[in-house]
């Protein structure tokens, strides 16, 4: 964050690259200056970085506000959009820039409140609600589908070649894409009235065939998201009861998908999912491709927080949640992993064999976990062969929404329960 502050422009704009500056990603890249210090606080419960970086965050918000066209309400700092997404051109960048502007404001309201800046917290909360209302008003049509601002100078702007015919002005068009629904749902930006429609729309975009920007029809359960949408799609699916689709999306191996590069020999995460293919070699796609790039690896968060179910209960993980989500499609029969928290290793593992779900977990010393285990009834849950509620370090809390809920003290546990 120090490097980002070192190259922050006098306008308040964060550059895409630090510490050397430069770049053209706009709001979608610059928002790292807001999101990273907030996520660092949530992960480690250390407000020091947030306090130190807060003036730079506030300056960036002032910059974002200065980019708003008073006539349209849209930001002029929106370039790359859903970079390398198969339907990037179908959505455009204005939708995502507006979403991230609102998301940044929501974070600022929480950060200001945490740091005791009450006046700032109220100001940013009001700004957030205003931007969220604008987002729903402008980017959701009467049919409860999302819209994108399409056309104009393109993602890099500019005047074009001398004598060239200027492009038509941008216009709002239907943008019925995975990214639009995933981002709006994942960030919590859609209004309560719009949410049910957007959930159905997201499910439809995942389960159907979709045409990419080149007009090629891609198979069902293809990953039609780019750098921005990929970070939100699996979370949005699981949060809204569509974990079967999240797993189908995960396990598809046809292009575009997470597993496609693996079938082409990938041992790292590529910037382009087809940066190299067995059939065509590099095929020109390596002209702008990193073979060690984070963005499509954002699914790792979902694997940790949803498949394994390791989630923060409070900042810092002294209290955390274990909420495993076994694969309802039956294709994936086990998962195991861990997170090394400040208090020690949090381990979570599930396996489905026949009609039995086996779940094991490790809770570090000086922490407690709340376990949500899929179970038709609490009486069916066993820990090391005995009724779970009678096991040392296990306290039954309630049964809700098809899950038995327990509080776990530090220790290692082995649960079994019939599959529901």
Labelled PLM ranges:
Residues 1-16, 23-24, 28-31, 42-99, ...:
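Active-site acid/base region of carbohydrate-active enzymes
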Residues 2, 6, 62, 66, ...:
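Generic alpha-helical structural context detector
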Residues 32-35, 52-59, 96-110, 119, ...:
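Generic recognition of stable, solvent-exposed alpha-helical segments in well-folded globular domains
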Residues 33-49, 100-118, 180-193, 232-241, ...:
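Well-ordered alpha-helical scaffold segments within catalytic/enzyme domains
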Residues 92-96, 220-221, 290-291:
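A short glycine-threonine-serine/GTX helix/turn-capping micro-motif
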Residues 138-142, 172-288:
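Extracellular polysaccharide-recognition and catalytic grooves
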Residues 244-420:
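Non-catalytic C-terminal accessory modules of carbohydrate-active enzymes
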């Amino acid at each position: 964050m120090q490097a980002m502050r070192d190259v922050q422009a006098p306008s308040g704009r964060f550059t895409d690259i630090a510490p050397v500056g430069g770049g053209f990603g706009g709001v979608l890249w610059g928002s790292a200056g807001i999101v990273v210090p907030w996520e660092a606080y949530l992960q480690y419960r250390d407000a020091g970085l947030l306090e130190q970086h807060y003036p730079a965050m506030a300056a960036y918000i002032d910059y974002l506000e200065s980019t708003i066209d008073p006539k349209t309400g849209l930001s002029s700092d929106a370039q790359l959009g859903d970079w390398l997404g198969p339907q990037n051109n179908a959505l455009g960048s204005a939708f995502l820039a507006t979403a991230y502007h609102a998301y940044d404001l929501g974070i600022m309201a929480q950060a200001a409140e945490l740091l005791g800046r009450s006046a700032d917290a109220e100001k940013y909360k009001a700004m957030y609600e205003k931007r969220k209302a604008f987002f729903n008003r402008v980017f959701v049509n009467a049919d409860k589908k999302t819209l994108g601002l399409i056309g104009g100078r393109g993602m890099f702007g500019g005047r074009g070649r001398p004598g060239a015919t200027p492009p038509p002005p941008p216009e709002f068009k239907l943008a019925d894409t995975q990214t639009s629904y995933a981002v709006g749902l994942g960030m919590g930006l859609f209004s309560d009235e719009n949410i049910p429609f957007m959930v159905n729309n997201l499910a439809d975009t995942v389960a159907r065939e979709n045409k990419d920007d080149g007009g090629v029809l891609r198979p069902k359960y293809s990953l039609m998201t780019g750098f921005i949408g990929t970070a939100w799609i699996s979370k949005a699916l699981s949060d809204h009861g569509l974990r079967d689709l999240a797993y189908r999306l995960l396990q598809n191996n046809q292009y575009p998908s997470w597993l496609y590069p693996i079938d082409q020999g990938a041992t790292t995460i590529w910037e382009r999912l087809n940066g190299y293919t067995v059939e065509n070699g590099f095929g020109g796609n390596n002209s702008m491709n990193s073979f060690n790039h984070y963005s499509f690896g954002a699914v790792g968060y979902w694997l940790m927080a949803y498949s394994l179910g390791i989630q923060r209960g409070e900042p810092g993980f002294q209290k955390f949640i274990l909420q495993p989500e076994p694969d309802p499609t039956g294709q994936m029969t086990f998962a195991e992993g861990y997170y090394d928290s400040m208090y020690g290793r949090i381990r979570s593992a599930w396996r489905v064999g026949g009609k039995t779900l086996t779940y094991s977990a490790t809770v570090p010393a000086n922490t407690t976990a709340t376990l949500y285990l899929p179970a038709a009834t609490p009486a069916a849950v066993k820990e090391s062969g005995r009724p779970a509620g009678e096991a040392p370090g296990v306290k039954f809390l309630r049964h809700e929404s098809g899950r038995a809920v327990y509080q776990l003290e530090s220790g290692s546990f082995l649960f079994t329960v019939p599959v529901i």
